[in-house]
């Protein structure tokens, strides 16, 4: 080996070491940023599910099941005008089942509106809150013994249930995807001892 080539070899080795160190740093930095973004995204998805779309979904499903049960008890296939002989049962179901579920949903929509997926408030959510407010007026009349109005003057927004189900399902799918990606599992194994 030529003595003149030793400095060149050492020089090349030093350059290669610096390149490898910088590459390792950039790869680590990039993966840390990607994992942080994924973690933040998962945190937002979880918050939306736990505080907004989850409660809306559960209350909506429970309300739908209860409403179908009431219709079945009354021998009806679909919503029809409430007859005089059904009024007592209707008031009971409204005050003990439907309005408490409506109140839960109304509170979630009003207090957690910042968690909606869209940039603008979906019209069906506004229509739902308006529907509930209409029922509050009807129920105030009931409390005074006035039963001429039987339903909210603002009808049930049919797209509300579709929106809630679709949004909940999309967020659950996104949550599952974020939780089960290979990078996320590796991150948890390395830094938390197990995959979550």
Where on the chain are the PLM-derived regions?
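Membrane-embedded hydrophobic alpha-helical segments
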Residues: 1-40
């Amino acid at each position: 080996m030529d003595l003149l080539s030793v400095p060149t070899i050492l020089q090349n080795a030093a350059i290669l070491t610096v390149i490898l160190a910088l590459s390792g740093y950039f790869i680590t930095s990039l993966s840390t940023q990607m994992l942080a973004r994924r973690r933040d995204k998962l945190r937002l998805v979880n918050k939306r599910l736990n505080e907004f779309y989850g409660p809306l979904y559960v209350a909506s499903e429970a309300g739908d099941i209860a409403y179908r049960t009431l219709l079945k008890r009354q021998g009806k296939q679909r919503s029809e005008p409430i007859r005089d002989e059904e009024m007592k049962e209707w008031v009971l179901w409204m005050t003990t089942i439907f309005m408490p579920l409506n109140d839960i949903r109304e509170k979630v929509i009003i207090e957690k509106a910042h968690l909606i997926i869209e940039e603008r408030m979906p019209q069906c959510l506004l229509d739902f809150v308006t529907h509930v407010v209409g029922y509050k007026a009807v129920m105030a009349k009931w409390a005074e013994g006035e039963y001429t109005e039987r339903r909210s003057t603002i009808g049930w927004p049919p797209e509300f249930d579709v929106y809630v189900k679709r949004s909940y399902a999309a967020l659950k799918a996104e949550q599952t995807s974020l939780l089960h990606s290979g990078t996320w599992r590796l991150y948890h194994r390395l830094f938390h001892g197990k995959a979550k």
